[in-house]
Amino acid sequence: MKIILFGATGMVGQGVLRECLLDAGIESVLAVGRSPTGQRHPKLREILHDNFMDYSAIESRLAGYDACFFCLGVSSVGMNEERYRHLTYDITLAAATTLARLNPQMVFVYVTGQGTDSSEKGRLMWARVKGKTENDLLKLPFKAAYMLRPAAIQPLHGIRSKTAWVQAIYVAAGPLLSLLHRVAPKYMTTTEQAAP
């Protein structure tokens, strides 16, 4: 299986990348991002790309893949709806539309979040935007599309959040997260489990 991974330097993406590289059933991983992953592995190829609204310059390198893990994401904290929509909806749909055209047999996996509002009418801005993103992804002509809605994700194996305040929470709550994972598995996952 050949995988494309967006967001390989974020916390969830780091976990997905690690698990993909360890999985004998995965032949290759193409990480598309603004910055390098900092990893070397025979299965790993990287494309550094700045314009997530236009893939025309790299389209030929995005064809021939079986699955995509789309792990790009930002917190909505302190963000207005227009900016959050651009970063969450517009960028995701630009990539997904391109990939669906180039790889019609692709499986697309989108990491979203628990509490996402599929009705697109709720009071929480982030949940509405995520809901619209999910709904429109499901309309694209992929072989299949899956929406992963984790609540809290415990980073393992030295994986860290790029967002300082989020990382501080994970450090402070580390022992509690392990306990929560055992007593409330519906609300807790790990970076291992968020991957294939």
What are these regions (language model features)?
Residues 2-25:
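N-terminal Rossmann NAD(P)H-binding glycine-rich loop of SDR-like oxidoreductase domains
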Residues 3-4, 9, 38, 45-102, ...:
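NAD(P)H-binding glycine-rich loop region in Rossmannoid oxidoreductase-like domains
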Residues 18, 23, 65, 94-100, ...:
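Structured catalytic cores of enzymes that bind and process phosphorylated ligands/cofactors
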Residues 22-27, 42, 118-196:
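Oxidoreductase cofactor-interface core, primarily capturing Rossmann-like NAD(P)-dependent enzymes
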Residues 23, 35, 74, 82, ...:
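Conserved Rossmann-fold NAD(P)-dependent oxidoreductase catalytic core, especially the SDR/UDP-sugar
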Residues 31-38:
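Short, polar loop motifs at secondary-structure junctions
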